[in-house]
Amino acid sequence: SDSDLRWIIDPLDGTTNFIHQVPVFSVSIALMEHEEVVVGVVYEINRDECFYAWKGGKAMLNGKEIHVSLMPDFNSSLLATGFPYSDFGRLDAYLEVFKHFMQHAAGIRRLGSAAADLAYVACGRFEGFYEYGLHAWDVAAGAFIVQMAGGEVTDFKGENNFIFGAELIAGNNPAHREMLKVISEKFNC
Protein backbone atom coordinates (compact mmCIF):
# COMPACT_ATOMS: atom_id res chain seq x y z
CA SER A 1 0.00 0.00 0.00
CA ASP A 2 0.95 3.67 -0.05
CA SER A 3 0.89 3.81 3.75
CA ASP A 4 4.12 4.31 5.66
CA LEU A 5 2.61 2.32 8.54
CA ARG A 6 2.93 -1.44 8.97
CA TRP A 7 1.43 -3.62 11.68
CA ILE A 8 3.40 -6.70 12.75
CA ILE A 9 1.12 -8.96 14.78
CA ASP A 10 1.45 -12.37 16.34
CA PRO A 11 -1.98 -13.21 17.76
CA LEU A 12 -0.55 -16.15 19.70
CA ASP A 13 3.20 -16.34 20.31
CA GLY A 14 3.76 -19.68 21.99
CA THR A 15 1.23 -21.66 19.98
CA THR A 16 2.78 -25.01 20.94
CA ASN A 17 2.53 -24.07 24.62
CA PHE A 18 -1.12 -23.14 24.11
CA ILE A 19 -1.92 -26.41 22.34
CA HIS A 20 -0.30 -28.41 25.15
CA GLN A 21 -1.80 -26.27 27.92
CA VAL A 22 1.57 -24.87 29.02
CA PRO A 23 0.57 -21.47 30.42
CA VAL A 24 3.20 -19.28 28.71
CA PHE A 25 1.93 -17.59 25.55
CA SER A 26 1.34 -14.02 24.53
CA VAL A 27 -0.05 -11.58 22.01
CA SER A 28 2.55 -9.42 20.27
CA ILE A 29 1.73 -6.23 18.35
CA ALA A 30 4.18 -3.75 16.83
CA LEU A 31 3.56 -0.69 14.69
CA MET A 32 6.26 0.36 12.26
CA GLU A 33 6.45 3.78 10.67
CA HIS A 34 8.96 4.25 7.84
CA GLU A 35 10.58 0.87 8.70
CA GLU A 36 11.06 1.88 12.37
CA VAL A 37 9.07 0.40 15.25
CA VAL A 38 7.23 3.18 17.08
CA VAL A 39 4.87 1.16 19.31
CA GLY A 40 5.26 -2.28 20.86
CA VAL A 41 2.83 -4.27 22.99
CA VAL A 42 3.27 -7.75 24.46
CA TYR A 43 0.38 -9.12 26.49
CA GLU A 44 1.12 -12.25 28.50
CA ILE A 45 -2.36 -13.66 28.77
CA ASN A 46 -2.20 -15.99 31.77
CA ARG A 47 -0.34 -13.50 33.96
CA ASP A 48 -2.50 -10.57 32.83
CA GLU A 49 0.67 -8.58 32.20
CA CYS A 50 0.75 -5.94 29.49
CA PHE A 51 4.23 -4.73 28.49
CA TYR A 52 4.29 -1.75 26.17
CA ALA A 53 6.40 1.13 24.90
CA TRP A 54 6.14 3.94 22.39
CA LYS A 55 8.70 6.07 20.58
CA GLY A 56 9.65 9.05 22.70
CA GLY A 57 8.08 7.43 25.76
CA LYS A 58 8.90 4.81 28.33
CA ALA A 59 8.71 1.05 28.64
CA MET A 60 5.83 0.05 30.89
CA LEU A 61 4.32 -3.01 32.58
CA ASN A 62 0.68 -2.61 33.60
CA GLY A 63 1.14 1.15 33.93
CA LYS A 64 4.48 1.13 35.80
CA GLU A 65 7.79 2.06 34.22
CA ILE A 66 10.24 -0.80 33.71
CA HIS A 67 13.96 -1.04 33.04
CA VAL A 68 16.34 -3.81 32.10
CA SER A 69 18.28 -5.44 34.91
CA LEU A 70 21.24 -3.59 36.35
CA MET A 71 23.12 -6.86 36.98
CA PRO A 72 26.74 -6.10 36.01
CA ASP A 73 28.08 -9.65 36.44
CA PHE A 74 27.46 -12.07 33.58
CA ASN A 75 28.11 -15.06 35.85
CA SER A 76 25.07 -14.01 37.92
CA SER A 77 22.88 -13.38 34.87
CA LEU A 78 19.76 -15.40 34.07
CA LEU A 79 19.39 -15.91 30.32
CA ALA A 80 16.60 -17.16 28.08
CA THR A 81 16.64 -18.79 24.68
CA GLY A 82 14.45 -20.72 22.32
CA PHE A 83 15.20 -23.89 20.43
CA PRO A 84 15.40 -23.72 16.63
CA TYR A 85 12.60 -25.27 14.60
CA SER A 86 14.57 -25.24 11.36
CA ASP A 87 18.02 -24.39 9.96
CA PHE A 88 19.57 -27.35 11.75
CA GLY A 89 22.81 -26.74 9.87
CA ARG A 90 23.56 -24.19 12.59
CA LEU A 91 22.64 -26.55 15.44
CA ASP A 92 26.23 -27.42 16.40
CA ALA A 93 27.07 -23.74 16.85
CA TYR A 94 23.85 -23.22 18.81
CA LEU A 95 24.69 -26.11 21.15
CA GLU A 96 28.23 -24.75 21.67
CA VAL A 97 26.74 -21.39 22.67
CA PHE A 98 24.23 -23.10 24.95
CA LYS A 99 27.00 -25.11 26.62
CA HIS A 100 29.12 -22.00 27.15
CA PHE A 101 26.26 -20.08 28.72
CA MET A 102 25.32 -23.06 30.92
CA GLN A 103 28.86 -22.94 32.31
CA HIS A 104 29.22 -19.16 32.63
CA ALA A 105 25.79 -17.72 33.51
CA ALA A 106 23.50 -18.28 36.51
CA GLY A 107 21.07 -20.26 34.36
CA ILE A 108 19.18 -20.55 31.09
CA ARG A 109 15.43 -20.74 30.66
CA ARG A 110 13.23 -21.61 27.68
CA LEU A 111 9.70 -20.28 27.99
CA GLY A 112 8.46 -21.05 24.48
CA SER A 113 7.40 -17.49 23.63
CA ALA A 114 10.06 -15.15 22.25
CA ALA A 115 7.77 -12.17 22.88
CA ALA A 116 7.46 -13.12 26.56
CA ASP A 117 11.22 -13.72 26.80
CA LEU A 118 11.88 -10.23 25.45
CA ALA A 119 9.30 -8.69 27.77
CA TYR A 120 11.05 -10.38 30.69
CA VAL A 121 14.38 -8.90 29.58
CA ALA A 122 12.74 -5.48 29.42
CA CYS A 123 11.52 -5.67 33.03
CA GLY A 124 14.69 -7.25 34.43
CA ARG A 125 13.52 -10.82 35.04
CA PHE A 126 16.12 -12.05 32.55
CA GLU A 127 19.43 -10.32 31.83
CA GLY A 128 19.52 -11.60 28.25
CA PHE A 129 17.82 -13.55 25.47
CA TYR A 130 19.10 -15.03 22.22
CA GLU A 131 17.62 -17.15 19.48
CA TYR A 132 17.73 -17.80 15.75
CA GLY A 133 15.04 -18.95 13.34
CA LEU A 134 12.75 -16.12 14.41
CA HIS A 135 10.19 -14.13 12.44
CA ALA A 136 9.40 -10.42 12.63
CA TRP A 137 6.11 -11.15 14.39
CA ASP A 138 8.05 -12.99 17.14
CA VAL A 139 10.37 -10.11 17.99
CA ALA A 140 9.34 -6.68 16.66
CA ALA A 141 7.27 -5.60 19.68
CA GLY A 142 9.41 -7.22 22.37
CA ALA A 143 12.72 -5.99 20.95
CA PHE A 144 11.38 -2.43 20.85
CA ILE A 145 10.21 -2.68 24.46
CA VAL A 146 13.69 -3.91 25.48
CA GLN A 147 15.30 -0.93 23.73
CA MET A 148 12.91 1.52 25.36
CA ALA A 149 13.68 -0.10 28.74
CA GLY A 150 17.39 0.68 28.25
CA GLY A 151 18.54 -2.61 26.76
CA GLU A 152 20.62 -3.52 23.74
CA VAL A 153 19.24 -5.49 20.78
CA THR A 154 21.20 -6.69 17.74
CA ASP A 155 21.51 -9.61 15.37
CA PHE A 156 24.34 -12.14 15.83
CA LYS A 157 26.77 -9.82 14.00
CA GLY A 158 26.05 -6.89 16.31
CA GLU A 159 24.05 -5.13 13.60
CA ASN A 160 20.47 -3.88 13.51
CA ASN A 161 19.02 -6.56 11.22
CA PHE A 162 17.19 -8.33 14.05
CA ILE A 163 13.54 -7.76 13.10
CA PHE A 164 13.71 -9.30 9.64
CA GLY A 165 17.06 -11.11 9.97
CA ALA A 166 15.79 -14.18 11.87
CA GLU A 167 18.33 -13.92 14.72
CA LEU A 168 18.46 -11.77 17.81
CA ILE A 169 20.45 -11.02 20.95
CA ALA A 170 18.84 -8.79 23.58
CA GLY A 171 19.92 -7.86 27.07
CA ASN A 172 21.24 -5.35 29.50
CA ASN A 173 24.57 -3.94 28.35
CA PRO A 174 26.91 -6.38 30.16
CA ALA A 175 24.90 -9.47 29.20
CA HIS A 176 24.44 -8.34 25.60
CA ARG A 177 28.15 -7.62 25.24
CA GLU A 178 29.14 -11.09 26.52
CA MET A 179 26.46 -12.91 24.53
CA LEU A 180 27.44 -11.09 21.34
CA LYS A 181 31.10 -11.97 21.84
CA VAL A 182 30.39 -15.69 22.35
CA ILE A 183 27.65 -16.01 19.71
CA SER A 184 29.56 -14.15 16.98
CA GLU A 185 32.58 -16.38 17.63
CA LYS A 186 30.68 -19.69 17.69
CA PHE A 187 28.52 -18.79 14.68
CA ASN A 188 31.55 -17.41 12.76
CA CYS A 189 29.91 -14.04 12.17
Where are these regions (language model features)?
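Hydrophobic residues within well-ordered alpha-helices
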Residues: A119-A122, A143-M148
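Flexible, acidic active-site loops/lids enriched in D/E/S/T/G that coordinate Mg2+ and/or position polar
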Residues: S1-E33, V41
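Acidic beta-strand-loop-alpha-helix segment within the catalytic core
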Residues: I29-L118, G165-C189
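N-terminal subdomain of lithium-sensitive/metallo-dependent phosphomonoesterases centered on the IMPase/IPPase/PAP
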Residues: S1-L12, E152, N160, P174-C189
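Short beta-strand and adjacent tight-turn residues that come in two discontinuous sequence segments
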Residues: E131
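Conserved G/P- and acidic residue-centered "switch" motifs that form tight phosphate/ATP-binding loops
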Residues: T15, E44, V146
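Alpha-to-beta junction loops
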Residues: C123-G128, G151-E152
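A short, glycine/Asx- and small/polar-enriched loop/turn
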Residues: S1-L5, F74, A122-R125, I163-G165
